């Protein structure tokens, strides 16, 4: 592992039964860098994320986040990593604000309403929708709520699985700009 790496795959191999899902994967991601895994269905993108989150174990090699081996120290990752899965479970009978409050309390994260509102503005979710039930939200609005929730974790590492799913082209551009802004902020703090 390189000493300046925040995320490191070192000869990472993951096998399930007799199938090799990842084979000798190697990469390093430094602080403030944006890194994307691209590939078709079955290429191993979600398997890679699950391995770095400690949800799947490496068969050989290692997956480390902030120096913690994801296979042997998964509990060490919980406060260091925020994860936005491809399909986020939010409660349709609760409003966007109520969902965020609930999931932050479950995670033990204490945030003020001002912090929450700032995150919702940052992801460009219209204010008139914040207190409406999620059952009235479009898929894109639900995704923006989930992104705001992930941002509120203030974790040094943010894993995103298909984060722009359900967003229109303008919202995708806004999201990409937001990710660049977040990465630049982390890079500036590391100097």
Predicted regions and their residues:
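Conserved structural motif at the start of ABC-family nucleotide-binding domains
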Residues: 7, 22-24, 78
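The feature captures the beta-strand-to-loop junction immediately N-terminal to the Walker
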Residues: 38-40
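Conserved ABC transporter NBD signature motif
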Residues: 61-72, 76-77
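Conserved ABC ATPase "signature" region
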Residues: 101, 105-108, 113-129
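Hydrophobic anchor residue at the start of the ABC signature
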Residues: 147
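Catalytic Walker B motif of ABC-type/P-loop ATPase nucleotide-binding domains
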Residues: 158-162
């Amino acid at each position: 592992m390189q000493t300046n790496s925040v995320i490191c795959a070192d000869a990472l191999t993951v096998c399930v039964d007799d199938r090799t899902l990842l084979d000798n994967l190697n990469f390093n991601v430094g602080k403030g860098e944006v890194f994307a895994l691209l590939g078709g269905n079955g290429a191993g993108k979600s398997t890679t994320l699950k391995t770095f989150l400690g949800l799947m174990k490496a068969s050989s090699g290692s997956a480390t986040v902030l120096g913690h081996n994801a296979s042997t120290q998964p509990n060490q990752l919980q406060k260091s990593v925020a994860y936005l899965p491809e399909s986020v479970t939010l409660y349709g009978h609760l409003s966007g604000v109520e969902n965020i409050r609930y999931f932050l309390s479950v995670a033990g994260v204490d945030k003020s309403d001002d912090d929450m509102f700032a995150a919702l503005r940052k992801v460009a979710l219209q204010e008139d929708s914040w207190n409406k039930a999620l059952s009235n939200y479009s898929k894109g609005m639900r995704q923006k709520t989930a992104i705001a929730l992930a941002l509120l974790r203030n974790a040094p590492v943010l894993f995103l699985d298909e984060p722009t799913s359900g967003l229109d082209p303008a919202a995708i551009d806004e999201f990409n700009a937001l990710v660049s802004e977040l990465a630049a902020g982390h890079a500036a703090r590391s100097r």
